[in-house]
Amino acid sequence: MCITSLKNQKEFELINKLGQKFYERYFILVIAKKLPKIFLESKYNTFLGIKVSRKLNKKAVVRNKIKRRIRHLMRIIVNDSSVKAIKFAIIIIPRKGFEEINFSHLNYELSKIILRNI
């Protein structure tokens, strides 16, 4: 696997500043193709940040399920041969209704945006 998570607030702020934002019905994406030096020296190709607020759902179980779904979706997308060699960072912020939407529809929407903009 060539995915690692964004670890601290500084990394999130850096990607927010450098990245391009895409607003969809069920999520917001921030994709940064031009990465700073600290990311380029890493052995990983993809850096993933997930922000699931308490506003989305009060229960931690549901928020953790959303995070698991997002990580699984990203594994599927990154294992695609056209994305493996590219270094990029992405922050995914789910919106209301994310937990009810069909997994295949989420996969389609997320992969469409990522593959088009990388």
From Swiss-Prot:
Subunit field text: Consists of a catalytic RNA component (M1 or rnpB) and a protein subunit.
This protein's name: Ribonuclease P protein component
Family, similarity comment: Belongs to the RnpA family.
Keywords, sorted A to Z: Endonuclease, Hydrolase, Nuclease, RNA-binding, tRNA processing
Gene source species: Rickettsia typhi (strain ATCC VR-144 / Wilmington)
PROSITE patterns according to UniProt: RIBONUCLEASE_P (PS00648)
Keyword Disulfide bond: no
Reaction(s) catalysed (UniProt annotation): Endonucleolytic cleavage of RNA, removing 5'-extranucleotides from tRNA precursor
Gene Ontology annotations of biological process type: tRNA 5'-leader removal
Gene: rnpA
KW tRNA processing (keyword) present: yes
EC identifiers of the protein: 3.1.26.5
GO CC field: ribonuclease P complex
Enzyme class: hydrolase
Cross-referenced SUPFAM superfamilies: Ribosomal protein S5 domain 2-like
UniProt xrefs under InterPro entries: Ribosomal_Su5_D2-typ_SF, Ribsml_uS5_D2-typ_fold_subgr, RNase_P, RNase_P_CS
Signal peptide positions (record): none
One Gene Ontology term of the molecular function aspect: 3'-tRNA processing endoribonuclease activity
Function: RNaseP catalyzes the removal of the 5'-leader sequence from pre-tRNA to produce the mature 5'-terminus. It can also cleave other RNA substrates such as 4.5S RNA. The protein component plays an auxiliary but essential role in vivo by binding to the 5'-leader sequence and broadening the substrate specificity of the ribozyme.
Regions crossing the membrane: none
